[in-house]
Structures are given as C-alpha cells and as structure tokens.
Amino acid sequence: MLTEFLRDHPVRELLSGGTRVLFPPAEDRRAWEGIPEGYRREIRELAGKYAAVTWPARTASGFLAFVTTGSRRADEDPYFTRRRKLCAEVLDACLDPDAVMDDIVDGIWMICEESTWVISAHNVNPIPGAPAAAEYPLPDIRKPYVDLFCAQTGMILSLTASLLGKRLDAVSPLIRKRIREEIRRRILRPFMATDDFWWMGFRRKDLNNWTPWILSNILVCAVYDPMPRAKLADLLERACGMLDRYLDTLPEDGGCDEGAGYWNMAGGALLDCLEILEKVTGGKMAFRQDEKIRNIMAFPAKMEMGGGWFANFADCDARPFISGERLETAGRMLGDPALAALGIRMRGTVAAQLNDTPHLTRALDLIFHAPAEAAQAAEPGDTWLPDLQVRLVRRGGWTLACKGGHNGECHNHNDVGSFILFRNGEPAVVDAGNMVYTAKTFSAERYTLWNVQAEWHNLPIIGGHAQKQGRDHAARNVKRTPDGMELDLAGAYGEDAGIGSLKRTFALDESGLKLTDEGLLREAQETEWIFLLREKPEWENGMIRAGSLEIRCPEGLEFSAEEKPVTDARMARNWPGSLWRVHLRGRKTDRFRMEFVFSASGREA
C-alpha cells in the first residue's frame, strides 16, 4: 500500500512541504505553559519521585541473569528505571526553564555509555548465524542489533536532544553530538545496512508488533537527525516497505491475535508511523480511508467487555493499559465516534505512559492533545472478526467473547473454542491471561507454563487429552450465528485423542449463555469439562453457583474445584486474590451431547 503510493509520489518531493519538528522544544514557552495544569502537576510529582532515585547500575551480571537464572528483571529493572527517570526529568525541565541540567546530563551520558541498548532477553535475537544466547550471553558491540527498546532508547534521546537542545549545548555541545553519533551507530546505520533483522520482513514473514513499534521509534530518530533530505527519503522509503510487509501479515478484519492489549504497540504504533509520515510530508501521505487501516484502528473497541475490561485471549491482560489518546486520535482521524469515545474514557496519565516500558512520544502526545469532552457512547454492538475467528456478543447485561482460530497464534495459548463471560460488566467465566515474562515465556518451555495450557482454559478434555500447540491444531467449520458462534474443535486436539468431531455452539440471550458440546469419539472415553471462574464455586444438585453466576449442568457429571491463588505480579493486577478451576467429569462414552446453561444466580434474581 505505502510502497505502491510512493511509486507515483517520490518521497524526496513529498518532503518539501513537511516538518521535522514533531513536538515543540522547551524554548517554545507558549506551548509548554499551555499544558493543562493537571498534567503539569503530575509531571512535577513524577520528577520529584525520580529525583530521589539514584541512577542505577546496569551490570554484566544482571545481563547474564537471563541465561543463568531465567530472570529478565535483573537487567530490565535498572534498564527501564534509567529511562523512566530521564523521561520524567526531561519533561519537568521543559516546564521549568530554570531547571538544573546536571542529573539529566548524567542520565544521557550513562545511557550513551551502555554497551548495548538491547535488553538481555533480546540479545542477538535472532540474527542469521548468531549463536544462541546461552552460548553467547553478552552483547557483541561490533555487531549492533536493533530490538524494541534499543529503538525506543534512540527515540527518548532524540527527543531529549530536540526538546532541550540549547540548554544541553550550554553545558557542552558534545552532548547532542554524542547522542547523534550513538543513534547513528546503534540504530540508523544498521537499519540501512542490513536485511537480517527478523522484524524487517526480509527473512521471515511472521511479523508482529515488533515491526511497527521499532519503526515508529526509528522514524523519530531519523526525522530529528540532521541528515540531508535525500538520505531521509531513502530511509522513509525503506521503512514504508517494512510497514507494507507488516500490513500484509494482518488479516483484512484488522484483528490482532496478540490481543487488544498489544494493539497499543501494534495498531497504535502503526498509527504513530502514519502520523509521522503525514507530518513530514505536510499531509501528502495519508491513508485514513483505507479499509484495512480503519479495521486495525477499530480493533480495541471491538474487543471491549465494558468498564475497562477486554477480551484477553492469548498473552493479553484482562485490564490492559491502552493509550486513550491514541484511541481518541484514531477515532477522530477515521471519523469513528465509538473509538473516539473509548479513547476519552481511557484517557490515562503521564505516569501510565512512563510506567513499564517508558514511551516519551506517547507522553508528549498526551500532554499536547486537546481532549474532547466524553460524549455519551452508543451501546456497543456485536463483533465478528472472520479472519481472527473471534466473536463478541452482547445481550442485556451479558457479554460473551469466544474464539476459534488455531494454536499457533502469536503469543499463543492453547484455547481454540474457549470463551469469556461477563455479567453487568464484571467477570464471571474468565481467561487467566498473561504472567510476568521470563526466559521460559518465548522458549521451547512455553507450554510448561500453566496459564497457556488448554487445561486452564474453558474447554473439554477428551480421554485425558488436551489441545495441542501448533498452527495445524485449529478450529474447523467456524460459523457466526445470530447470537454466538459454532465450530468444530476436533482439529485442535491430537490424533491420539480419538475425536471424530467435537461441535461447540454458543448462544447468548438476555437470560444468559447456552453452551452445547456434541462429540463423536472413535471409542468410549471419559470427557472432562473445565471452567475457570472468578468466584468460588459451590455445587448443589447439578448446579454450580459462583457469586452472581449460576451454571446448570447436565446429569451424571462429577464435580470438583480447586483454588488457584494468583501469585504472579502481572496476573495479580487483573485478578487479585484467587481464580477457581472447576472440573466436571463425565462417564465413558463414544458420543455425547452436553448442554450447560449460564444464568444469573437465583439468589439475586
């Protein structure tokens, strides 16, 4: 799409009417003094908090810990603390023209002195011919690699140099020169010189959020670098080719199999790239009417369960941080009032943009964004994403999210045919979602983690056999129905499960959900149904009661339940306390038709 446009519109000509200033520098006092007081106060508080934080050491032993112990935090804690502290102090210095620059200069110099801007978990990830991290656990500074956070560090330093340029020069002109050379050495030169980084799409086609996320930051680095227009044009054209390869991997329905939470740095990062291209070309590169782009931008609104909750299939958080400013901007840009309204409701804070992996451009987008008043949002409709095979249905106080797809998705969980059920905006039947990333998360040991296993999703287990991972283990005969979806789950299991067919049907109405499973097996086997519940379940006469939820079960099932205390820090943000796994064991048979009815508890009716 982008490359095709550039065939008839040379980038060098497009750049003649654009700007290379993405945000106002600190000396533009009118702009910085016009920032809303709430944001000004928050920035001052953040800067005060980080002023008390000593610049942490980033050590070789901390970097090595990813290989020696599996810990990412030993390297990432000091790594991201440095960058959060720098971002907070830079924003504060932009507000205060008399701010002392010493601590900021220390942070800049320290980051420039780092052997690598790549985090330990991404070391040599994966460059053709490079040894595995276990054999090569420290970075080779002769072979710079660009990962997510190397590019993001370049963005932070580029903006720091632009925002505080004259004040940094007053300390020493060598500071900005050092920033420029480090960005060129670590990011811009490798970007132009090699096709080997997997996220570029030359060597691999299975691209994900890495591509737009990295490119959005490289574009900031390039725009602020004083390179000649011809060189910038070459870089932008190369980046557009990579964005096209990323877009080619996405389905026409705009769905992101990484989950709504990953839209932030997938579709949201794509929006960053498109905005930068619009600005530097004076609006000549604009793709607002492209149907696929519109679908990508609207994806989070289609996945909302209500009240800040989202359908959290795969490695998505149930209550993810999504940039409300990006959502609102996308909604305004595309004329999508539902998307804009969601963004206004999720407007967020400066601190949220700097938490986790600090994103200075998003913080600047937020504070210079003139938010609209929250409009009365229309009632959300149903969602059907035919390529992703995800369905959301809303009836009365109930919201159902269910999926088909396959078990080789990005950030995959073995969850073909699983579902999530909310009542009155509160979770009832849930997906546990994500945990803190470790060395196991994206390794051959991924499926030893309980939260990704089929046995912890809302699925049947046939003769002791759960679903298997891999793209070939997929749903069949997936059909949208007026009130839900039907699909055959048999293909998601291995041949050893002996399943001829396993049809699952979802039907939601204002009274609740009817879930029907019909199985034909090659021989008589015991089937077990798993439901993961938010509240503690009780069993009485074929009925499960869990908080405000009631599940009427078929006859002849044996009930048991287990508490799963949520001890993982990331998961606990979504599910403090415990989750509860229900087991319903049936008798041996070679065929069955089982109907489960989920409704409001009679004690509340």
Which residues make up each language-model segment?
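Carbohydrate-active enzyme catalytic cores, enriched for enzymes
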Residues: 267-428, 480-482, 575
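Solvent-exposed loop and edge beta-strand segments that line ligand/cofactor-binding
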Residues: 17, 70-82, 133-151, 196-212, ...
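Short glycine/serine- and small hydrophobic-enriched flexible loop segments
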Residues: 90-94, 155-162, 220-224, 268-279
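Long, well-ordered core segments of solenoidal/helical folds
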Residues: 47-58, 104-122, 175-199, 234-254, ...
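CBM-like, beta-strand-rich accessory domains located in the C-terminal region of large
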Residues: 124-128, 151, 343-353, 437-605
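Active-site lining segments of carbohydrate-active enzymes
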Residues: 135-259, 365-376
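Non-membrane alpha-helical segments in proteins
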Residues: 80-95, 106-110, 151-159
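Extreme N-terminal leader/anchor segments
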Residues: 1-43, 88-94
